[in-house]
Design a protein with these regions (language model features):
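Active-site nucleotide/adenylate-binding loops and adjacent lid/helix of ATP-dependent enzymes
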Residues: 2-126
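ATP-dependent carboxylate activation and anion-phosphoryl transfer catalytic cores
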Residues: 56, 105-111, 115-200
């Protein structure tokens, strides 16, 4: 399966928390809370939907919050901000398949400019490690070594052996890079037209 919208209807009730980013964050010990729960101190926080099956960071914002959070949208939550590299790791039946690093536009949580294959095996919290052995395919998103999302499907963009991928967005202009091949890859979940791919 390639889409979270396909996975959700088949999940058992005990596993639904995997797609609940607030519960996941709480289980991992992050500073977080739903709309209405005050923040522990005044700072910038990441605010995003508790559940977002469409993915790609949609609805995510960085907001300065003094204390109260009643002004946030219902169904959203706040969480401490993590800095560092953005990694996407695929597992199949408990074994790591690949690890990729993503680079996005500085002011956007949606538009990634490229993804590259990296030779790394990030250490996972035990609760997340257990998930990788319970399902055939698991994709894990991390920032600065902190797990931020779980998906019970894989990242299909690198299945064909690509080592670098550049998304082509419908609202961005891309010129074809040298030594890359264009692959049309439109879908209903993301506003992208295709991918430029580079192979060894």
């Amino acid at each position: 399966m390639f889409y979270d919208t396909d996975v959700w209807p088949q999940l058992d009730n005990e596993s639904l928390w995997i797609y609940d980013k607030l519960i996941l964050s709480r289980k991992l010990g992050y500073k977080c809370g739903p709309c209405g729960v005050p923040v522990p101190y005044a700072a910038d926080y990441i605010v995003r939907p508790i559940i977002n099956l469409e993915g790609q960071g949609k609805g995510t914002e960085k907001l300065w919050i003094e204390h109260d959070t009643w002004h946030l949208k219902f169904g959203y939550f706040w969480q401490e901000i993590f800095a560092g590299r953005h990694l996407s790791i695929d597992y199949h039946k408990g074994s790591q398949l690949r690890c990729t690093e993503g680079f996005r536009e500085q002011k956007s949580f949606v538009h990634f400019t490229r993804w590259i294959l990296v030779d790394e095996k990030p250490k996972l919290p035990l609760i997340v490690q257990d998930i990788t052995t319970q399902y055939d395919d698991v994709n894990i998103e991390m920032i600065g070594g902190n797990v931020i999302e779980l998906h019970l499907r894989k990242n299909k963009d690198f299945d064909d052996g690509a080592i670098e991928v550049i998304p082509v967005w419908e609202d961005r202009q891309n010129s074809k890079p040298e030594n890359f091949f264009y692959v049309e890859d439109t879908d209903d979940e993301r506003p992208r037209l295709g991918l430029y791919k580079r192979y060894e």
